[in-house]
Amino acid sequence: MSLTLEHVCRVVDQQIYIDDACLSFEAGSFNVLVGRTLAGKTSLMRLMAGLDKPTSGRILMHGADVTGVPVRQRNVSMVYQQFINYPNLTVFENIASPLRQAGVAKAEIERKVHETAAMLRIEKFLKRYPLELSGGQQQRTAMARALVKDADLVLF
């Protein structure tokens, strides 16, 4: 999977959020966006995920132009800085939720949730509710939900 931003700009109410961004991310790579407060890091991630549409420029995934394609039509996962878990669902149910929405078979959901939870060392918390966990455990639950669906692009 590759993701390329070609001369991407984002302007909202005459304020420039992103100005002529040209970036390329290769499959399997680990990349970090670093910048001062209000530098546009979150705005850039929202553009990459498809949550926002650029004012100009193009966004390519696998070489195909996905500029303006809604997030639901992309295979993308994103964990926000202020991560969100569903408090009335167990950790297992939180992690399983994107798989259930995608119509994945019950046995496959079971396998993938346990595999992902083990990778993030939260398997022993699967029957608990998010508010019973520490902040770090809650964050790992949100990360597991993003990772379990094997998205082409995962943004943290």
What kind of feature is each model-predicted range?
Residues 129-133, 137:
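Conserved ABC ATPase signature
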Residues 49:
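Helix-to-loop junction immediately C-terminal to a conserved catalytic motif
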Residues 57-65:
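Conserved ABC transporter NBD signature motif
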Residues 148-152:
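A short, proline-enriched helix->beta-strand linker immediately N-terminal to the Walker B motif
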Residues 89-98:
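Short coil-to-helix segment of the ABC ATPase nucleotide-binding domain corresponding to the Q-loop/switch region
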Residues 65, 100, 107-125:
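Conserved ABC ATPase "signature" region
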Residues 154-156:
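Catalytic Walker B motif of ABC-type/P-loop ATPase nucleotide-binding domains
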